[in-house]
Amino acid sequence: LEFFPDVSPRFASPFGRCSNPPKAVANRLAAAPRQLLYTHSGGNMPQYLVNRFAEEIANGETELALICGAELLRSTQNARKAGLKIDHNEDPGGEPTRIGDNRFGFSDEEARHELRAAIHFYPLLENAIRGGLKRDVASHMTAMGRLFERLAAAAKDNPLATRREGYSAERLATISDDNRWICFPYPRLMNSNAIIDQAAAVLMTSVGKAREWGIPQERWVFLHGCADGTDTWVVSERERLDASPAIRGCARIALDMAGKSVADVAAFDLYSCFPSAVEVAMKEIGIADDDPRPISVTGGLPFFGGPGNNYVTHSIAEMMNVVRKRPGSFGMVTANGNYLTKHSAGLYSTEPTKGPWRREDPKKFQTELDALPKQRVNTKPGGTG
């Protein structure tokens, strides 16, 4: 997964970079892989890669795939403050194959109005959600606090989480010195926390190879259903800002592929960079506000940590632990890139899949999404108001 410093100059490390990260990993493992892939930016990419490699493995095109990523922005920040001299430059040679969509997530017109970053787009979506619910600001702040209190509680019980205080809904919704406004209506503790040190990896293979390599069967987890889809790319052209046809469809396709319903899912890890991402996902998947099932198994990006493009690798790894503890149960992971734009979903269980593993061609669903109505943006509005 692409490192944050390679995504944005804002996060560039003063200590150098690796020119070919997947090859550097392969060298350390004494491996000679057929493919060396390095993603473009997108929080959807870990689940997207799982979906892609599952299909390749099922078709006999790939025997083993390693999906991995890491961020060390906390260590980098601390080392810079301490004036340390560190050399992270590495050139293992060659260039990786890039994968993903590297288009800007915003239009020229949006950029003209300073809409370029997640911390500007997601608050915009949040205010659309509040407007649709006809809530006043105070009531909506309380509702967001209650929602993210659930994530904070999950992080409190997770030894790998970076913020384990177990914040209350009131604390999360109250502006204070350590919970200042970032962009209305989000205070600091409702934002993804990118300044962390975290790494995760997922290994994928077939049942035959797992047996051949002696991987204990109690460790096996199967991908029962999956889907990928992209909403209208330009946020200002979307018909509604409080909806995501792509999330709705990804969940439906993944569940249909597995022959399951939403009621059959024991736990969810919904992409949680900001409250609006979780609220829209819950609505589109059909998870009620008072549903007691987990909506995050890690603690989410604000409390577990938001390691750039790699968060969902952590989601998947932790969901594997969850379903292993409850053999036969099902867990759903959703992933989101850009501004509630690029989506992937996966349904996991220790229960083996039945029959040949086949997924619907993602192009079919994407064609449906691309045919949805779009708003026309008036770049030169007039009027007296």
What is the meaning of each model-derived region?
Residues 1-3, 35-41, 66-70, 139-146, ...:
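Beta-strand segments within the central parallel beta-sheet cores of soluble alpha/beta enzyme folds
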Residues 91-115, 123-150, 182-244, 317-318, ...:
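Condensing-enzyme catalytic core mediating Claisen C-C bond formation in acyl metabolism
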Residues 1, 29, 211, 251-264, ...:
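Phosphate/pyrophosphate-binding loops at sites that engage ATP/ADP/AMP, CoA/4′-phosphopantetheine
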Residues 2-20, 24, 80-82, 135-142, ...:
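Metallocofactor- and cofactor-centric catalytic cores in central/energy metabolism, strongly enriched
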Residues 10-64, 68, 72-107, 115, ...:
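Conserved catalytic cysteine-centered active-site region
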Residues 159-217, 256, 263, 267-283:
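Accessory "access/gating" subregions that flank catalytic or transport cores
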Residues 41-71, 116-157, 202-209, 256-260, ...:
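Active-site-proximal alpha-helical scaffold in enzymes
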Residues 260, 271-278, 284-342, 346-353, ...:
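Glycine-rich anion/phosphate-binding loop at the beta-strand->alpha-helix junction
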